[in-house]
């Protein structure tokens, strides 16, 4: 329980690491898009990073006994203004940076790869904490609504991150 309390206290502080990624390479806000984004399972699979990603390992026997940063990949609304609502904002650097900082400043063991999941992914329920960026223009598909509802009612945590201003 102490680890969970510490984690919940540190997340607001570490969320700044996500915001710090806003003006990395590519378009402002880290909006560069690569086709690999649609099929990647981890942030490390993407061939492009603004800085070399940090590397660390965990003991092999504890591969499933770690915190895993899990980003939700979703459709972009066709009605959104340019750049609004894209799930890949600050990806992959923010995922790797937050995971590294959690590993660095807490006693948590953190998966160095993180995950990218769709809400319909059967593995969703293996991750108690999921991250969704730019939900201001979120439009869930009919099949995603009951899955997300069940995930949340079963104790899953959704962090919704939106830095675009008051209009959202």
PLM region spans:
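N-terminal secretory signal peptides that target proteins for export/translocation
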Residues: 1-2
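Bacterial N-terminal signal peptides
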Residues: 5-16
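Alpha-helix boundary/interfacial micro-motifs
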Residues: 19-20, 145
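Aromatic-Pro/Gly-enriched surface loop or interdomain linker
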Residues: 20-129, 133-136
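Short alpha-beta junction capping motif
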Residues: 69, 129-168
């Amino acid at each position: 329980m102490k680890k969970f309390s510490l984690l919940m206290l540190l997340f607001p502080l570490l969320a700044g690491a996500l915001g710090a990624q806003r003006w990395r390479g590519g378009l402002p806000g880290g909006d560069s898009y690569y086709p690999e984004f649609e099929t990647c399972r981890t942030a490390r699979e993407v061939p492009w990073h603004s800085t070399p990603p940090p590397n660390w390992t965990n003991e092999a026997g504890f591969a499933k006994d770690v915190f895993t940063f899990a980003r939700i990949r979703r459709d972009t609304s066709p009605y959104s203004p340019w750049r609004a609502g894209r799930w890949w904002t600050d990806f992959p650097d923010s995922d790797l940076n937050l995971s590294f900082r959690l590993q660095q400043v807490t006693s948590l063991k953190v998966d160095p790869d993180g995950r990218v999941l769709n809400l319909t992914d059967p593995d969703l329920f293996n991750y108690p904490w999921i991250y969704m960026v730019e939900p201001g223009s979120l439009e869930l598909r009919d099949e995603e609504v009951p899955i997300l509802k069940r995930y949340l009612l079963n104790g899953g945590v959704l962090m919704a991150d939106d830095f675009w201003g008051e209009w959202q």
